[in-house]
Amino acid sequence: MSMTDPIADLLVRIKNAAAVGKQTVKAPSSKIKVAIAQVLKDEGYITDLRVTALENNKSELEIVLKYFEGKPVIATLKRFSRSGLRQYRGKSELPKVMNGLGISIISTSKGIMTDAQARQLGVGGEVLCFVA
């Protein structure tokens, strides 16, 4: 059975694993999921990520979660644009999360990046999710 929204599935897996205190999360891998995980790593929300090749030409993404004083670093992880209602924003309309304390992950023509990076490059795009 195919998945309707693989990005939402990844975000829910991360959120649920962090809520119960797991160290790692495994999910089916894709280029966009790896790019989102890389942004999370670059921004300090996760410790590490690994892509492992499986049989049948498939791969698995493993994310090592980050905790501070026993609490997950990711407090809020929310999907914004979804398969039924895509949310596109121009460079001047990119949302700030928690007044700049969190990040928005944006899919632009120049790749997947944070809202701050998109503003700096002067590009807009699809707002994938919010992280705080």
UniProtKB/Swiss-Prot annotation:
GO biological process: translation
Residue pairs linked by disulfide bridges in the UniProt entry: none
UniProt KW Membrane keyword: no
Species: Stenotrophomonas maltophilia (strain R551-3)
Listed InterPro entries: Ribosomal_uS8, Ribosomal_uS8_CS, Ribosomal_uS8_sf
SUPFAM superfamilies hit by this protein: Ribosomal protein S8
Family named by the database record: Belongs to the universal ribosomal protein uS8 family.
PROSITE patterns the record matches: RIBOSOMAL_S8
Record's protein name: Small ribosomal subunit protein uS8
Keywords: Ribonucleoprotein, Ribosomal protein, RNA-binding, rRNA-binding
A family per Pfam: Ribosomal_S8
GO CC terms, sorted: ribonucleoprotein complex; ribosome
Quaternary structure and interacting proteins, as annotated: Part of the 30S ribosomal subunit. Contacts proteins S5 and S12.
GO molecular function: rRNA binding; structural constituent of ribosome
Function text: One of the primary rRNA binding proteins, it binds directly to 16S rRNA central domain where it helps coordinate assembly of the platform of the 30S subunit.
